Amino acid sequence: MEYTIFILLLPLLSFLVLGIGGKWMTHRTAGIIGTTVLAVVAVLSYATAWQYFSAPRLADGTFATLMPYNVTWLPFTSTLSIDLGILLDPISVMMLIVISTVSLMVHVYSFGYMKGERGFQRYYAFLSLFTMSMLGLVVATNIFQMYLFWELVGVSSYLLIGFYYTKPSAVAASKKAFIVTRFADLGFLIGILIYGYYGGTFGFTPDTVSLISGGASMLPLALGLMFVGGAGKSAMFPLHIWLPDAMEGPTPVSALIHAATMVVAGVLSLIHISEPTRQ
């Protein structure tokens, strides 16, 4: 599954190409580039899922957790470090399919829906950034890497909701979404730091559970703060106030944020975070 790295690199490349060189492109060219890249990403995601679920299961009948890529970015101690990589498990593989498929449909639909709109190239650049951020979030190998992509999701959603920046209501809606989710993300970050300090790891795979025993008394606080972050991203009460106003963005963006990807990011993070505590 060495090609899985391209699932992240291709939309990132699309964002850079459209963001930097989009003003010299026609609307048609920008749309074709963005849509074609997402089509390739979707094919790679389906290929990854096919290969993953076709592989032999473990002795207990479960699917293996794989890390095709994992490099240490910032080492702190022998056990505590910030790694960057790709983690594949049944949840992340299925989410790759969901995100790539829905995002591809949004790209295709937007080609006609946004025709003639000012900033067409910028729109497709932001879509590529949002998609890359969501894909990176679901395949993160640890909680801190998840947080990095988590913030990229917030930034890209702010840019998409406020796409019509000459419209005061759209600007207000984007600011509201950004501020509310940043408030929740602050709790998420504090929870991650407590989790890493007392647990001795940022990992959320089951084999790291033994490292948490020394900080068991602080674990509920860390998980509670991380839950606040998930609640904000998933628009749970009382941090739901930003979601209705997100309709100020282009309609395809609203579909992408409301129904498909961003609002499930919080739930997905809570599933991953709960894994080290199942003992």
Give a label for each model feature:
Residues M1-S274:
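...captures the hydrophobic TM-helix bundle architecture rather than a specific catalytic motif
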Residues E275-Q279:
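Short "domain-exit" segments at the C-terminal end of structured domains
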